[in-house]
Amino acid sequence: MRSLGITGGAGLALGAMSSIGLAPAVASTPRRFQAPAAGDLIGKVKGNHSVVILGGGPSGLCSAYELQKAGYKVTVLEARNRPGGRVWSIRNGTEETDLNGETQTCTFSEGHFYNLGATRIPQNHNTIDYCRELGVELQMFGNQNANTFVNYSGNKPLANQSITYRAAKADTYGYMSELLQKATNQGALDQVLSKEDKEALSSFLTDFGDLSSDGRYVGSSRRGHSAEPGAGLNFGTEIEPFGMSDVIQGGIGRAFSFEFGYDQAMTMMTPVGGMDRIYYKFQDAIGTDNIEFGADVSGMKNVPEGVTVDYVVEGKAKSITADYAICTIPPHLIKRLNNNLPSDILLALDAAKPSSSGKLGIEYSRRWWETEDRIYGGASNTDRDISQIMFPYDHYNSDRGVVVAYYSSGKRQQAFESLTHRQRLAKAIAEGAEIHGDKYTRDISSSFSGSWRRTKYSESAWASWAGAGDSHGGMATPEYTKLLDPVDRIYFAGDHLSNAIAWQHGAFTSAQDVVTHLHQRVAQTA
């Protein structure tokens, strides 16, 4: 079972265990957020109770939205000229000057876009709840596609070959099933499985791996056809399988477990028209008179009257004092503010390490991925710097579309960070052509790229905690835990203070947690 988990991911191992009655039951007891209500404070607590919120991204706008429900006076200060923060949809007219000093203006055709930030929503995330509440229309997001490719470089067997996911899965699952079938038949599992267990496992493996009657994998229609079945006696031509040794050594199944992840398994969703639609809806609900865009925060201090925040708008220095503050500025940028935070808090903030990630979108005037490769959504994966090529999930069968030519993170993204956009584009096209061929280099109308480490006011795609075992969760490091509590009247919120780092869900749960504690604190003053 352990080898099944390593090769095919947890889903394959659990499937086999379930077949013989060994899979554990899963219990789920979600904790529901109780939003503050209008009657909570009226007639009970004196004062208007103002809250200034630093940052108009997911956690900031969510905090403002929920606090307004109970009658709090909220002011959101956002340095950019748009809502959403790192949730950023690139479309015609988008203009940005990065920290390299290069300015790009997007010229995509009307109605076409890509999400430079968050792009997908798991169905178990509370992001969907806010979409329902705010009236944001959702559509399916193709997180996986059997027709997209894997292509890995190097000198191992099957290297530098574009292999469809369906073929890679059929061969990998087929041979792994054959090997486990042989091990079972040869008595290797007699110490742990009864006769009935082995019969049940054999039945599962025969079906899962599409094995022959004698327990061998000899190919499968699941791989696809070089000539599709047609009418009459046209039975099509199945594609022959790769050899067992080549499949094992080539590691073509290395990306299979991605779609087994709790937060990556289908069905995935995304807003129609771009992920930023959520934040324009938040903006409408909160009211633009309660959000100040272009507000570059320079200072934040606890004072006897509450919290004073200094900021600059179009070169003019301004200041606001509120009863409380919720700071959603990225942790590694907070220490740049003029502040009176204790030294242990500054050290805790410094433990949140910025990460590299970025994307490049190419608008093609011809949807070759649909007409030639029959790809509708999903992504091709590689070990090259581009990491993956993501295909559009909208405008199917139209005349053009935007392909995300890379979505890379870590060291692979660092290979793009210092490059100009033209250099990024050239590198992306060259690596993409190694997967999808010469057609990848033609019919390009326009492009736009972004690197979050080189994006002003973010300078990171997400934060990871030094010493944590999981880059996408706080894992209760001392620094992480320290920032869960307020510093006098200053609260901290963001996905970095959740166990869903880099997800909008994480930002929302953090905001909900802060709103709950702040509201309880105010109510206790009654």
List where the protein language model places each region:
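N-terminal export leaders
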Residues: 1-17
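Conserved flavin/dinucleotide-binding core of flavoenzymes
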Residues: 3, 7, 21, 26-39, ...
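N-terminal glycine-rich phosphate/pyrophosphate-binding loop and immediately adjacent elements
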Residues: 36-178
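Short glycine/proline-rich turn/loop motifs
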Residues: 41-45, 105-113, 253-267, 406-415, ...
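Rossmann-like dinucleotide-binding core of oxidoreductases
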Residues: 156-179, 183-184, 323, 334, ...
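Core domains of carbohydrate- and sulfate-ester-processing enzymes
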Residues: 160-179, 241-246, 250, 332-333, ...
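Active-site/ligand-binding neighborhood in enzyme catalytic cores
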Residues: 181-296, 304-306, 321, 337-338, ...
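Mid-domain catalytic core of redox enzymes
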Residues: 293-404, 435
